[in-house]
């Protein structure tokens, strides 16, 4: 029988069918090749939006810089970055007036964080531009390399382990006339293999010292590397995102800590909360506007869209905001917060890998690195690329483009939200001094504006005033893409509101299925996702039951663990059948061992091992959960583990799931082919770190391990701990006098060695 799909929606309000319009099934698009073109687009667009600003030259690096602040206001709707300083400061003052003490309290909270944050905060995060190697690296490695270079250049404040001391080193490094770095390089030589007598290429890794003068170092310290944003759904064109280096990251972190603290106190801010908490916050604002508009007023809501939010923001504006927010604070605190925007005003965008050329006739491929774009003959390029390169050439220095205006994606989400909320705050009647008033929601570049007025003319006037106020602060509401509707129906950060939030289930689709961590975690994550969606996303019981059956089927195919009594033949079926036949209580076998599925929608919260424990044969229990079993990883089994889920929009979310350590909680081994590459030096560093950390953990078992707030190095902490433990053990008779003396002697020797160093 054919079903007419439109019949499905007859009883459903349009908003509830929103899920069907989202591009979230199937694989998202990924980018291939270099991001150079996208980065040039960003740089050129940003300059175009601020083109009527003032040009200056950076005295240290010689980079040309464009400053649009207080520039001419646009006469038309074109997006522009000409924010007016006095307007921004006034908006901040009004924000403070309506929230007495908000800035002061946030500063006090932030000061506490600044003094306690450890430098290892910077190891969080994925790819980071490593200025010592001039390419991207995992955050922890980039930080290690930076600290190593700092120490070899005599910058040792970072040894305290506090982030603020590491930042002191960063500031001092910028005053140095030269900085010496170590670069890794590869030597190849042909040698004859003794056994096979064939010639083979032998690779050795060399390290060589290399000096950067002040200008080169500053350029690297101010560089943001760029890459293409992957897996963006619903877009035809890719776009560039930035990864800043370690010099900038710490300063940005403190600014964002302050801004986050402010956002938490603002009812219009969609950050830093998420999920149901965010929905509740938004629903409150809507309720407030609707209750006040019942009798005499009409109320409209704009589902807002801003044109190129990042490219029209300006770090100089953020500096003005920070200066105002921290106005009565200690000098050191104001200084440390003002460095991030200053660095961003002088930032350089690295153009990425460059362009790939191939000649069809000669079957040749060659890469033109970004450094060559400044003076290569343009006849090789097509017209659009030619235009891009011509435009960007005046800005190029050593393969990086000077990019003073604009903020790269995702750098100051919290602070830019504060700026947006300050405009929403101006909608109160005491500020508009007329019959219309507004309120709304802001989350980074996304906003929803609710306007109330006695009549349509008032609504129009309110929207116009909001639009013009935004222009004064360098925010460009897009008239083409924003949409106005009677209050009660709008969209904000992909939440659809229709007299209450509608579940947008399609957003969750990517997280259904088998994650691919290991058999144990995947089972747990799979059922947790279904459970969470029943709680948060209107996933009904029948659909959930179906999702569960599909998940189990998917899981069995992934791990080839079909039931022991099935006819399906896989690589594992021989072993699984054998286990099935020798098991008395077959219901006790885990699904991953060919057992039946005992999950239904009522018991999704129970880990599978616990669900089946009473049903298991004793010898199966013993094999499954035996601490001496060589296949069980006992690295760190917490009762709750975190899986990184990739939701449809927004950053990867941490999702908690129950973890029970069994033979199925294996951790796959690292691919060893890295040993033949220039990354080998990095691997050795990592192993050294691993050893140090393991040693440290032996001294401080997790129960007693509190991060030291005082300033002491790992070695000092370990030595003092060893002395305390030794004394306790000696006094309680657990160790002999000779052993005690030996430990004390070793501790003194270590301290002497440290002093000599």
Swiss-Prot record:
A motif (Nuclear localization signal) lies at residues 187-195, 203-216. It is found in: Host nucleus; Host cytoplasm. Pfam families: Flu_PB1. Transmembrane segments: none annotated. Gene3D superfamilies: 6.10.140.720. InterPro entries: RNA-dir_pol_NSvirus, RNA_pol_PB1_influenza. Keywords: Eukaryotic host gene expression shutoff by virus, Eukaryotic host transcription shutoff by virus, Host cytoplasm, Host gene expression shutoff by virus, Host nucleus, Host-virus interaction, Inhibition of host RNA polymerase II by virus, Nucleotide-binding, Nucleotidyltransferase, Phosphoprotein, RNA-directed RNA polymerase, Transferase, Viral RNA replication, Viral transcription. One of its GO terms (biological process) is symbiont-mediated suppression of host gene expression. GO terms for molecular function: nucleotide binding; RNA binding; RNA-directed RNA polymerase activity. Residues 249-256 are annotated as: Promoter-binding site. Residues 53-82 are annotated as: Disordered. Residues 286-483 form the RdRp catalytic domain. Influenza RNA polymerase is composed of three subunits: PB1, PB2 and PA. Interacts (via N-terminus) with PA (via C-terminus). Interacts (via C-terminus) with PB2 (via N-terminus); this interaction is essential for transcription initiation. Interacts (via C-terminus) with human PKP2 (via N-terminus); the interaction competitively inhibits the interaction between the RNA polymerase subunits PB1 and PB2. This is RNA-directed RNA polymerase catalytic subunit. It comes from Influenza A virus (strain A/China:Nanchang/11/1996 H1N1). The lineage of its organism: Viruses, Riboviria, Orthornavirae, Negarnaviricota, Polyploviricotina.
């Amino acid at each position: 029988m054919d079903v007419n799909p439109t019949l499905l929606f007859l009883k459903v309000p349009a908003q509830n069918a929103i899920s069907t319009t989202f591009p979230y099934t199937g694989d998202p698009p990924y980018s291939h090749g270099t991001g150079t073109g996208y980065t040039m687009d960003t740089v050129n667009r940003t300059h175009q939006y601020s083109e009527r600003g003032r040009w200056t030259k950076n005295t240290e690096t010689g980079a040309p810089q464009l400053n649009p602040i207080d520039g001419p206001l646009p006469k038309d709707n074109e997006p522009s970055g000409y924010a007016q300083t006095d307007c921004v400061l006034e908006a901040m003052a009004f924000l403070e007036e309506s929230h007495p003490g908000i800035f002061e309290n946030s500063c006090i909270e932030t000061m506490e964080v600044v003094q306690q944050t450890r430098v290892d905060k910077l190891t969080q995060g994925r790819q980071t531009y490593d200025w010592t190697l001039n390419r991207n690296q995992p955050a922890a490695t980039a930080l290690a390399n930076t600290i190593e270079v700092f120490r070899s250049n005599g910058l040792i404040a970072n040894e305290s382990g506090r982030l603020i001391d590491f930042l002191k080193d960063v500031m001092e490094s910028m005053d140095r006339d030269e900085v010496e770095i170590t670069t890794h390089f590869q030597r190849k030589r042909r040698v004859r293999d003794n056994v096979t007598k064939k010639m083979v290429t032998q690779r050795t890794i060399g390290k060589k010292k290399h000096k950067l003068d002040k200008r080169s170092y500053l350029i690297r310290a101010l560089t943001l590397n760029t890459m293409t944003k992957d897996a963006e759904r619903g877009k035809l064109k890719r776009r560039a995102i930035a990864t800043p280096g370690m010099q900038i990251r710490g300063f940005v972190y403190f600014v964002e800590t302050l801004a986050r603290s402010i956002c938490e106190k603002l009812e219009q801010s969609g950050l830093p909360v998420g999920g149901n908490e965010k929905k509740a916050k938004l629903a409150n604002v809507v309720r407030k506007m609707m209750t006040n508009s019942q009798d005499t007023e009409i109320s409209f809501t704009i589902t807002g869209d801003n044109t190129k939010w990042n490219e029209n923001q300006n770090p100089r504006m953020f500096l003005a905001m920070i200066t105002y927010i921290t106005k009565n604070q200690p000098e050191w605190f104001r200084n440390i917060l003002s460095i991030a925007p200053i660095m961003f005003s002088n930032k350089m965008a690295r153009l990425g890998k460059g362009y790939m050329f191939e000649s069809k006739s000669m079957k040749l491929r060659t890469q033109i690195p970004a450094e060559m774009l400044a003076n290569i003959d343009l006849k090789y390029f097509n017209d659009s690329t030619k235009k891009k390169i011509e435009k960007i050439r005046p800005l190029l220095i050593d393969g990086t483009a000077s990019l003073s205006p604009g903020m790269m994606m995702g750098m100051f989400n919290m602070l830019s939200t504060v700026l947006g909320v300050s405009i929403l705050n101006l909608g109160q009647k005491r500020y508009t001094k007329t019959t219309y008033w507004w309120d709304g929601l802001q989350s980074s570049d996304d906003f929803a504006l609710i306007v109330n007025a006695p009549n349509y003319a008032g609504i129009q006037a309110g929207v116009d005033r909001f639009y013009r106020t935004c222009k004064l602060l360098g925010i460009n509401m897009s008239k083409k893409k924003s949409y106005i509707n009677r209050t009660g129906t709008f969209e904000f950060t992909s939440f659809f509101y229709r007299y209450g939030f509608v579940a947008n289930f399609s957003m969750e689709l990517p997280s259904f299925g088998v994650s691919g961590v290991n058999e144990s975690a995947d089972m747990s994550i799979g059922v947790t996702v279904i459970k969470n969606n029943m709680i948060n996303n209107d996933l009904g019981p029948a659909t959930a039951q179906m999702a569960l059956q599909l998940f189990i089927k998917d899981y069995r195919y992934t791990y080839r663990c079909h039931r022991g009594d099935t006819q399906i033949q896989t690589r594992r079926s021989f072993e699984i059948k054998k286990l099935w036949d020798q098991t008395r209580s077959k219901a006790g076998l885990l699904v991953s061992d060919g057992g039946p599925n005992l999950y239904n929608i009522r018991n999704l919260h129970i880990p599978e091992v616990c669900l089946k424990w009473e049903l298991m044969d004793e010898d199966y229990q013993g094999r499954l959960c035996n601490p001496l079993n060589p296949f069980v990883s006992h690295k760190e089994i917490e009762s709750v583990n975190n899986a990184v889920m990739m939701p449809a929009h927004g950053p990867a979310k941490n999702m908690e799931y129950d973890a029970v350590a069994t033979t199925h909680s294996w951790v796959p081994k690292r691919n060893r082919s890295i040993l033949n590459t220039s990354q080998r030096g990095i691997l050795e560093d990592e192993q050294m770190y691993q050893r140090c950390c393991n040693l440290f953990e032996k001294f401080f078992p997790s129960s007693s391990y509190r991060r030291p707030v005082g300033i002491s190095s790992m070695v000092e902490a370990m030595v003092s701990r060893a002395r305390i433990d030794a004394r306790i053990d000696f006094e309680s008779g657990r160790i002999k006098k000779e052993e005690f003396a030996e430990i004390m002697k070793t501790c003194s020797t270590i301290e002497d060695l440290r002093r000599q160093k």
